[in-house]
Amino acid sequence: MIVLGSTGSIGVNTLFIAKEKNISIEALSCGKNIKLLNEQIALFKPKFVCIQDEKDKHLVDHKNIFCAQDGLKKMISECKSKFVVNAIVGFAGLNSSLIAQKLGKTLALANKESLVVAGKFFDTSKIKAIDSEHAALKCLIDKRKDIKKLFITASGGAFYKYKIKDLKNVSVKEALKHPNWSMGAKITIDSASMCNKLFEIIEAYHLYGIKQIDAVIEKKSLVHALCEFKDGGISAYFSHANMRLSIAQAILDEHDQSFIENLDLLAMPSLKFEKISLKKYPIFMLKDELLKNPDLGVVINAANEYLVYKFLKNQMGFLDISKGIFKALDHFGVPKINQIEDVFEYDKRVRLYLDKEMK
């Protein structure tokens, strides 16, 4: 298979499972972590590799090196593998998802932004979501037609215990302390702002075609999703917070090997479900509007991505993320997305607008 974003958290865990199950790796891609990429090259001996910056080419221990977005497209096209794991972070992963589907490859998707910004351009029946919530939903839905509502859970992120007034001056270091999951910087900030949960809701809509979706806080991250049925019953999916489970479910057809420990029900702490506070997590206010107009995902994602990286560089405060998103939405409204080129155009326009407005 092809693993894009191989040096990130999802990529590393995907390769762990690939090694365990003797899955051959035809191609790897990464951003800047050339040291880890070289270790992966030595272990998996891929036919091709792709890196972000051509300037780093001399550092890579490989002969067949592609570079940047154009290189990624060429590499995926040259690969014979029919299975692509896309674990690239952010909007940068969209092109790879599009080319993989165009070539008829099965897409194991950790890059949720592909669906957030361009869900209507994908055949989601050929996508396997690498996400604990969506893997849980798939298991719970299981061909049932009598679904009333879906729920995914949120931990509350790094600032669950913080008072609203204290969020104004939080540091990047504080924001990156996720209570339950070990993830990359971008998604950890998205978890703290609840933008991640907003994205997972629209992702679930594109994957399963159900608009009756909500999220609740379950701060232990032991319940990942719930499915409410018309007969009055509710099913819930429990597991430890470990991405290896949903990766294995996406990349292996059938397996009986355990990649994580089962929960010990008798040792499990008491669980509590809570409503998401819109005062503390104002971004989540956009849920119903986004489900009504999924094309808003292009504006929200571009704004969020731009603002999160500004925050990570200490160039703005944490609360500026939500403020900037609402500012962009006020300016652009519901975008007219008729073709995939419109997605790229709006993404560019939103970033340019915020670059001017948020100085």
From Swiss-Prot:
Residue positions binding 1-deoxy-D-xylulose 5-phosphate:
K112, S132, E133, S155, H178, S191, N196, K197, E200
Required cofactor names:
Mg(2+); Mn(2+)
Q: Do the record's keywords include Coiled coil?
A: no
| GO MF entries | 1-deoxy-D-xylulose-5-phosphate reductoisomerase activity; manganese ion binding; NADPH binding
Q: Which residues bind Mn(2+)?
A: D131, E133, E200
UniProt pathway annotation: Isoprenoid biosynthesis; isopentenyl diphosphate biosynthesis via DXP pathway; isopentenyl diphosphate from 1-deoxy-D-xylulose 5-phosphate: step 1/6
Q: Where is NADPH annotated to bind?
A: T7, G8, S9, I10, G31, K32, N33, N111, E113, G184
Family matches, as InterPro entries: DXP_reductoisomerase, DXP_reductoisomerase_C, DXP_reductoisomerase_N, DXPR_C, DXPR_C_sf, NAD(P)-bd_dom_sf
Q: Which residues form a coiled coil?
A: none
Functional description taken from the UniProt entry = Catalyzes the NADPH-dependent rearrangement and reduction of 1-deoxy-D-xylulose-5-phosphate (DXP) to 2-C-methyl-D-erythritol 4-phosphate (MEP).
Q: What is this protein called?
A: 1-deoxy-D-xylulose 5-phosphate reductoisomerase
